[in-house]
């Protein structure tokens, strides 16, 4: 199931601090369903960090369905999320998607969160 993000369920950080990255992610990949998700402590608070079926990382508030940020992971970031989720490896279809994303849109790697 795709994730719908609009002005009511996204934080200022996502669309005010990083508008170009968010626009490109929406344009190139969209916000698809979460395949692997972990809890992670960010800036003293826990958040949900998920890898989507499009190969994008979406970070969401723990207690609300609000997006904090999204970014295109490199291979190590994807592996780390899967390891923390208890998986031995990134699911093969997702791994191929991430590698294609990196080949097609390497500029997004430099738009960090």
Predicted regions and their residues:
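Ribonuclease/tRNase effector modules and their secretory precursors
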Residues: 1-113
């Amino acid at each position: 199931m795709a994730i719908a993000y609009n002005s009511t369920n996204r934080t200022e950080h996502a669309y005010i601090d990083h508008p170009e990255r968010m626009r490109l992610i929406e344009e190139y990949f969209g916000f698809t369903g979460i395949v692997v998700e972990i809890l992670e402590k960010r800036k003293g608070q826990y958040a949900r960090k998920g890898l989507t079926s499009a190969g994008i990382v979406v970070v969401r508030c723990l207690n609300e369905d609000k997006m904090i940020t999204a970014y295109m992971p490199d291979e190590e970031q994807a592996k780390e999320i899967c390891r923390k989720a208890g998986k031995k490896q990134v699911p093969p279809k997702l791994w191929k998607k991430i590698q294609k994303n990196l080949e097609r849109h390497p500029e997004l790697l430099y738009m960090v969160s």
